[in-house]
């Protein structure tokens, strides 16, 4: 079994402290001229609501950038409601905020978890994300997605270890290794590095994105919150110094096979469709027994079956 206690590193040129990537990831970094540091909190519904735009950016321009998730662990869970939704203090307020975010951005998000099994801290799920990343960057991405599904869709308290283990299983992680890493010095050190990076980059709200190119002397571009899709494409162009070429369109079935479990809004955003049209096309694949419809409280999800 791999031992991960010291697999962290700091980029002194940028002031970034983060996990070592595996060899394949290092090769990918060399091929891609940009990096996007994505500051999140696992309890943040607005971070979850950004998934459709992030997928569209990856599908259309993913050849130009690599994403690094930074857990903004210093931010208090209550502070996630600031910005557009100031003043939320009680559990009822938080549940209402989550419903409003669903209405605003379209990504299903069930705030009843605050009424049924309230969460007291984002520390444990943040630590779990770092533990998952010790099995590789893509393992961390898969785990983060499953953790969000458990929280925002299934109203499960992601501070509980049995729920985190379920996330690890569904993400295809080595569960025995994950359980050990969850209590390891390596995961704790990685989280401390993320907290330090958050502080050094003066990030006080999530989601926040910092775009870097391969010129370490050039400052990154920091963007906090949600903007129209074309703004992010323009930032890519500014950082690259040329107009990026959009990748050939991905078929709907290829997209579903790649991501396996997606919301109607994710399909609609990626393929520039209205929700009704997106669901019409998705239902055709259900009839072909290639998809399963999974209704949620505030919207539909679709699971790929082949």
UniProtKB/Swiss-Prot annotation:
Subcellular location: Cytoplasm
GO cellular component, one term: cytoplasm
Pfam families linked: Thioredoxin_5
Primary location class: cytoplasm
Top-rank taxon, per record: Bacteria
Function statement: Adapter protein required for efficient degradation of Spx by ClpXP under non-stress conditions. Interaction with Spx stabilizes Spx and exposes the C-terminus of Spx for recognition and proteolysis by ClpXP.
Protein known as: ClpXP adapter protein SpxH
Organism field: Halalkalibacterium halodurans (strain ATCC BAA-125 / DSM 18197 / FERM 7344 / JCM 9153 / C-125)
Gene: spxH
